[in-house]
Amino acid sequence: MSLLLQHQFKPLPADKQIDTCSFLDSVSHLPAFFDCLGSAIFSPIKADITGNITKIRSVYESNPTKFKTLQMILEGEKELHGPQWPKVGATLALMWLKRGLKFIQVMLQSIADGERDDQNPNLIKVNITKAYEIALQKYHGWLVQKLFQTALFAAPYKDVFLKALSKGQTVKEEECIEKIRQFLVNYTTTIEAIYIMYNKMNAELDYKA
């Protein structure tokens, strides 16, 4: 599971502040996750994640001290942009990025929990569908939702997906699942902290893309 474990997310401090530099370093390797799904149909989600990472990094690098944590970015942009906030800058980029990260988290957790289609246990459509419905569906219009339904037909078999996560190495499914669980510990905590931060700051928007 080197694709995931090589770039583990760091544990959060007690105050749940997320260091921007560390976060960007870890999250920048996640777009490759969508290559493991084996279809160009998933490329829009990958491109969206990549683009939002770039926007956040640009804001951070403009003043690393001022934007040391993700919360400092939101607070700084709120003060800077006034009534335009939160639909602006890195605040908007992180809002969409966290949804893409949530998609990955729910999908991997579903696989780790053993959720599957009993009629087709080696398919991961059930896991992908759950992740999409929880993380992204409500923010997508009718056309994008239809495109996603089409993408499901191109989803790989579970063994092919796990092998891709392992960078082509043939490993036992139990070992892959255990490494997914290890990755999810800090990753899930980080995603949850971002969602809580957005709710506390009233930065969440529900418009459809």
UniProtKB/Swiss-Prot annotation:
GO molecular function, one term: ceramide 1-phosphate binding
Residue positions binding beta-D-galactosyl-(1->4)-beta-D-glucosyl-(1<->1)-N-[(9Z)-octadecenoyl]-sphing-4-enine: D48, I49, T50, G51, N52, I53, T54, K55, H140, Y207
GO biological process entries: ceramide transport; intermembrane lipid transfer
GO terms under cellular component: cytosol; membrane
Record's keyword terms, sorted: Cytoplasm, Lipid transport, Repeat, Transport
Primary site of residence: cytoplasm
Xref: InterPro entries: GLTP_sf (IPR036497), Glycolipid_transfer_prot_dom (IPR014830)
Cellular compartments annotated: Cytoplasm
Chain spans, region 2 X 12 AA approximate tandem repeats: 45-66
Sequence repeats: 45-55, 56-66
Cited function: Accelerates the intermembrane transfer of various glycolipids. Catalyzes the transfer of various glycosphingolipids between membranes but does not catalyze the transfer of phospholipids. May be involved in the intracellular translocation of glucosylceramides.
Family the entry assigns: Belongs to the GLTP family.
Record-given protein name: Glycolipid transfer protein A
Annotated source species: Xenopus laevis (African clawed frog)
Gene: gltp-a
